[in-house]
Amino acid sequence: MPLLHVNGISVPCKAILFDKDGTLLDLMEMWGTWAESVLRDMETHMALIGAGFTGDKNLLLGTVQDAKGRITGYDPGGPLPMATVEQTYGILAWQLYAAGVPWNDAIVRVMGIAKDAMNELRERRAAKPLPGLLPFLAQCAQASLRLGVVTSDESHTTAEHLEWLGISSYFGAVVTRDRVVKGKPAPEMAEAACRELGTLPEETVVIGDSNADMQMGRGAGLRLAIGISSAAGTAEHLADADTVVRDFTELTVSV
């Protein structure tokens, strides 16, 4: 059985599951840019109806902005890295509803704003792999490890992002939020990925950047839960991780 080496320990495993945003790809490069566009357009839209955000707009998605409105960081325990598409729509639509827009219209308007922001990303194919990811995936393939993706994103956007990164062929299972009844931190996504890869939970490792990933792994009985803390620079938000790394340069695989 291949060995995964991390922080001085060697773990036998047959499969590794990866979160997508903030794990496979740089979250700020993708969703920081998206959030910047969405919040800007939301602010403009609300000004047109004589309204404003009910509070600090950074608290909507858990972003950190500079004086010019550019997003420079995010709360690792906030909506930007963890919320599903539907949850994000709900957070944003509530602002319009509070300003007097009927809920159904608020949802439609938010979906339009979010779609425009995503189309901007598509034009740039805005996906950047985390440091060391591509060599690490090559090591995994060489060791015949089975790889899967478990993400709170939806199927069509996940497929796009993996294709932009050029890594689609590495993964034998891609479990997205729209494929399960209960998303993270429930164990269902990890359990489904293990079934599709043909491995047992105790032979499988999960790597992710949120504590929801760690809780999912623990709930599914996975062998090890590895947290990635590169975006926040701290591991405090990864309370349920077995061990924490900055990026994939701190992981190696051997046979």
Task: Locate each region found by the language model.
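Charged, low-complexity surface patches
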Residues: V85, P129, T151, V206, ...
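N-terminal helical cap/lid subdomain that shapes the substrate entry/recognition surface
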Residues: H5, V11-P131, Q142-A143
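Asp-based, Mg2+/Mn2+-dependent phosphohydrolase catalytic module
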Residues: M1-I16, T44-H45, L134-A141, S155-V255
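Conserved phosphate-coupling serine/threonine residues in phosphotransfer and NTP-handling enzymes
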Residues: T23, T151-D153
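Short, flexible loop segments at the rims of nucleotide/cofactor-binding pockets, characterized by
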Residues: E123-K128, S152, K182, R223
